[in-house]
Regions:
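Eukaryotic N-terminal targeting leaders
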Residues: 1-6
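Conserved catalytic-core motifs of GNAT/GCN5-like acyltransferases
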Residues: 137-143, 153, 158-176
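Acetyl-CoA-dependent GNAT
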Residues: 9-106, 110-112, 123-125, 129, ...
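Conserved GNAT acetyl-CoA-binding A-motif
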Residues: 123, 130-143
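Conserved G/P- and acidic residue-centered "switch" motifs that form tight phosphate/ATP-binding loops
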Residues: 117-119
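Short hydrophobic/aromatic beta-strand or adjacent loop that forms the aromatic wall/cage
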Residues: 64, 175-179
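Helix-turn-helix
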Residues: 148
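Active-site beta-loop-alpha junctions enriched in small/polar residues
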Residues: 107, 143-145
């Protein structure tokens, strides 16, 4: 099986031009899969762009790590928008009592590139980076019953439980949320 792509850390000086492509993958996951992912239909392109710009700003101050999955990478490190096929983020809020915790957010894979190991590649890179930063307890949530729930189980995340009616679905109605954690060894 060929490699799912190349995982690269987001660098604001090299990758800020990808903001519309990040927003497009996010929008596709909401409209195509009805994923609970921050926004409801009808989507506002401006809201999505603004949301991603805020996340990008957090990468610049060290509170957030963003990893990109790309189909190819040229030697300069510059990525063309269509080469972007996935993203995942690690949020690392300041906490003296929880400096070892990190929160996995927005594991999003373009619909045409799923089932090829991209989620595994992104999560493996995220876990390595989390370890390097001393974040040994990872927490996340996802919509119950979706593909991501099965992916996180396969990747060794332990289910904490389900919360009924946790989020509003873009398809309408409330959906349950499943919470996971994983302890990383240093």
């Amino acid at each position: 099986m060929p490699a799912p792509g190349v995982v690269v850390p987001f660098d604001i000086s090299l990758h800020s031009h990808l903001t519309p492509y990040l927003a497009a993958i996010h929008a596709s996951c909401i409209t195509h899969d009805h994923t609970i992912a921050t926004f409801l239909l009808p989507l506002s392109h401006e809201k999505l762009l603004s949301w991603w710009k805020e996340r990008i700003a957090e990468t610049n101050d060290g509170r957030r790590l963003m990893l990109l999955l790309v189909s190819e990478l040229d030697p300069s490190g510059r990525i063309k928008g269509p080469e972007l096929i996935g993203v995942v983020m690690l949020w690392m809020p300041y906490s003296e009592t929880g400096s070892f915790r990190g929160y996995v957010e927005k594991l999003l894979i373009h619909k045409h590139h799923r089932g090829k190991g991209g989620a595994r590649a992104l999560m493996s890179a995220l876990e390595a980076e989390a370890r390097n930063r001393g974040r040994t307890l990872l927490l996340l949530d996802t919509e119950s019953g979706n593909q991501a729930e099965a992916v996180f189980s396969r990747l060794g995340y332990t289910e904490l439980g389900k919360v009924p009616g946790y989020g509003m679905s873009p398809a309408g109605g409330l959906k349950d949320g499943t919470f996971f954690y994983k302890t990383l060894e240093l």
